[in-house]
């Protein structure tokens, strides 16, 4: 079966209407994992299979450095691993990793109270939770708030068990309770690691210049973390819309309906 020009136009229009962000937005897709309880939160890749059942995005920077971002969820918690594969010089309690999330997909210019960031330094087991909505420009409109009881974040050094490199390098592990940030099928999402020796932030989305502690850009510059269902659908609703449009065209073709 060959689609005629009109049918192709319908598909293209459907894509433009229903799926504008799939082409233009920077996105990371997370995945469901049922082995979260097996994770050993010690700030390193403890055993080979530990983070295997999570999504994977390798961020490559212009200076040759690489950052692996792995994400997953079990319905109650979000798991994030920032594996800075290329960083081999360490500054304990100065290097850090940070994860920022918001359920507000409109992503305002100024942080609101539904914007959260979780920061942990290298060598620390004590994360900091930052919440938006503060009036102080000096703190990027974020203020420190109480950690959720279930929050875990640890900065450490991975070694021979790491999937990407056996050379010791910085790694940051996060377990973020979903109730602490709210449920959504699409989160605003930003992650970064700070290399104190070079005074440089490596982040996703890339090319956001902000070395001022805690290196949190405007939420309007964050990307998206697409979660599998409203509790965290296997695809976000725009994909269903696209698929439905495509199947509708195929149905019309099979019925040989003339326009």
Language model region names:
Residues 226-240:
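Short, threonine-centered small-residue motifs that mark membrane-proximal processing/anchoring sites
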Residues 121-166:
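Glycine-aromatic-enriched beta-strand/loop faces of beta-sandwich-type recognition domains
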Residues 167-211:
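Ser/Thr/Pro-rich, low-complexity mucin-like regions
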Residues 43, 77-85, 170-178:
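Short, well-ordered beta-strand segments enriched in hydrophobic/aromatic residues
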Residues 21-25:
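Sec/Tat signal peptide C-region and signal peptidase I cleavage site
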């Amino acid at each position: 079966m060959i689609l005629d020009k009109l049918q192709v136009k319908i598909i293209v229009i459907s894509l433009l209407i229903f799926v504008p962000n799939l082409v233009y937005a920077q996105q990371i897709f997370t995945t469901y994992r049922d082995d979260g309880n097996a994770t050993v939160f010690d700030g390193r890749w403890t055993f080979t299979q530990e983070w295997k059942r999570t999504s994977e995005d390798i961020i490559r920077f212009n200076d040759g450095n690489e950052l692996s971002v792995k994400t997953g969820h079990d319905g109650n918690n979000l798991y994030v691993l920032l594996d800075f594969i290329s960083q081999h010089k360490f500054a304990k309690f100065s290097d850090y990793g940070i994860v920022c999330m918001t359920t507000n997909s409109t992503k305002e210019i100024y942080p609101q109270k539904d914007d959260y960031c979780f920061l942990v330094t290298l060598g620390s087991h004590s994360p900091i939770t930052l919440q938006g909505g503060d009036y102080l420009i000096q703190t990027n409109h974020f203020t420190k708030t109480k950690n959720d009881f279930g929050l875990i974040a640890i900065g450490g050094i991975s070694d021979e068990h790491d999937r990407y490199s056996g050379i010791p390098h910085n790694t940051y592990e996060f377990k973020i309770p979903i109730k602490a940030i709210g449920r959504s099928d699409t989160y605003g999402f930003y992650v970064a690691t700070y290399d104190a020796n070079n005074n440089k932030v490596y982040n996703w989305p890339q090319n956001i210049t902000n070395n001022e502690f805690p290196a949190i850009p405007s939420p309007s510059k964050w990307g998206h973390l697409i979660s599998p269902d409203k509790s965290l659908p296997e695809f976000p609703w725009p994909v269903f819309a696209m698929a439905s449009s495509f199947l509708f065209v195929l149905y019309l073709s099979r019925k040989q309906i003339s326009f």
